Amino acid sequence: SRKIVITKKIMEVRKSQDGISGIKVLLHIKNKSSFAFTKLNITDYLPKLVAPSKEFGTIRPTTVQRSPSGAIRVIWDIPRLERGEERIISYNIRSRLSIIGRFTLPGATVEYRNKKGRLIRVHSNRLTLLIPEEKRE
């Protein structure tokens, strides 16, 4: 069984006339084991059509990296997660262009070391939005 689980949810979708202008994303990390973990690394990946806004909800990221292809990695370091503890990371992303049609947000990952020191990587779900085109009269 997984000791640490991560789920990705969309809390809010802000629409403009041309499609989606912003999305509020929530990452839910839970320690289901009977012991604490230290030095967790959470990475969320954003496609090149979107970028994180400057406002971060609960926990500010340690770093935001842009790859040469334009995709973005948002990274949070969590020093310690106690047994049974849950962390909620929320942040807003804005789109550079209005998004219409199918839009997929890749899954996030949590990396941590187990008691034996082995690196464990857990992936969250991916999210797909279907944005209908607005009918214009």
Where are these regions (language model features)?
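Low-complexity, intrinsically disordered segments enriched in Ser/Thr together with acidic residues
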Residues: 77-107, 112-117
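Extracellular/luminal low-complexity Ser/Thr/Pro-rich, glycosylation-prone repeat/linker regions
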Residues: 1-10, 106-137
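A surface/secretory-pathway sequence property marking extracellular, secreted
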Residues: 38-83, 120, 125-127, 132
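Short beta-strand elements of extracellular/lumenal beta-sandwich folds
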Residues: 10-12, 16-38
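Short solvent-exposed strand-capping/beta-turn motif centered on an Asx-Ser/Thr pair
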Residues: 30-36, 45-49, 96-98
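Residue-level recognition of well-ordered beta-strand positions that form the cores
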Residues: 9, 26-30, 43-45, 77, ...
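Hydrophobic core residues within well-ordered beta-strands of beta-rich domains
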Residues: 4, 23-25, 87, 103-104
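Extended acidic, low-complexity intrinsically disordered regions
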Residues: 1-2, 10-17, 68-70
